[in-house]
Amino acid sequence: MQSIQTVSENTIYVGASDRRLAKFENLFPIPRGVSYNAYVILDEKTALLDTADASVGAQFLENVAAALDGRKLDYLIVDHMEPDHAAMIEAVLVRWPDLRLVVNAKTLPMLKMYFPTDGAAFDDALVVKEGDTLDLGKHKLTFVMAPMVHWPEVMMTFDTTTGTLFSADAFGTFGALEGALFADEVDFAGKWLDDARRYYTNIVGKYGVQVQAVLKKAATLPIETIAPLHGPVWRKNLGWFIGKYDLWSRCEPEEKAVVVLYGSMYGNTASAANALAAKVAAKGVKVAVHDLSCIDNSEAVAECWRASTIVLATPTYNGGIYLPAANLLEDLKALNLHDRTFALVENGSWAPMSAKLMAAKIGELKNCTVLDAKVTVRGRLTATQDAELEACAAAVAASM
């Protein structure tokens, strides 16, 4: 059964959601699933903007056919070549062989790489560049190059008639759609924002400079609707979500807040982390606490983007950093986290040294500060260490 929805005048949503996939990119847990969005514009000429993942291929093709309602498909616009959006290109070409592909110069080599048998269609492709326009009749589409947001060939398509920005992976989020298509129809801040932050920080976070460049381009466009390739479509309160992207891409904390991230084998480091968190909270500071062994690394990364101060509490393990914390620090470096304050808690039954090792890793991050006040636990926290905890808590609160 087809499942299509109207986005705006003669623009139809033809995507589909997958609730079976356990991990996005086989890396990031998505307990709420994910949507693969695609759109059809009906005019004197028809256009399909992107395809979908193979997992929803049958539903996607049925939706496209329903939207076209017997009409031929004139154009397939490829904004992004990642297989979760491009997997069905070959199937679309088989079903509508007379269509013309619309791509940019960086897309063509990828098309030939992923679909080596479709040379004729690729040779006839319309290759567009920044500012080029495709006239469908009433709808005029302008192309905005968005390299490395988050692949080199990415572009966005702006419908000047409806003010719709088809934004590729930008402004996307984890989470399958639940009937409602639009962000204003759901509790986005309550139910979707954490997934949107986790999506941005782990998928796009490394490319903040490139996102900033695209935001500057977007600021010159009269955008009424943002139609991403994942998650709800935005037609109201666009400035709020664009503001989030501006913060995230500048790696500026969303909140003056503390996140305590700890690893603990037998509960002793956890006890110290919780004791420190309580002292910080008592000073009127907003605090969140997470066990790194119980949350996915992608969630910890997102929390580090959200909060202004990060407390890492870990035992020494094989003379090194407890592995969940070590993995987090490697990811933070790879994703270019910067401008944060860190406080450290270490534990070791005979040679505590994780604080020194973590500080060295944090030193590889741009403009990050490690507070002098740290807590060293030998086996388990004792009552005599209350002053040490208090000093660390005071330093954390002062860092706000």
Task: Describe each PLM feature range.
Residues 4-66, 156-159, 163-167, 269:
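Conserved beta-strand hairpin/beta-sheet module of binuclear metal-dependent hydrolase folds
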Residues 5-9, 102-154, 210-213:
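Metallo-beta-lactamase
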Residues 44, 55-102:
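Active-site metal-binding motif and surrounding structural segment of the metallo-beta-lactamase
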Residues 45-47, 75, 139, 163-166, ...:
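Structural motif
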Residues 49-51, 73-81, 101-104, 165-169, ...:
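Active-site neighborhood of phospho(di)ester-bond hydrolases with catalytic His/Asp-centered motifs
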Residues 88, 296-300:
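Short acidic active-site motifs
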Residues 150-154, 162, 170-205, 249-253:
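Active-site-proximal loop/helix segment associated with metal-binding centers of metalloenzymes
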Residues 177, 188-226, 230-233, 275-290, ...:
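FMN-binding flavodoxin-like domain, especially the glycine-rich phosphate-binding loop
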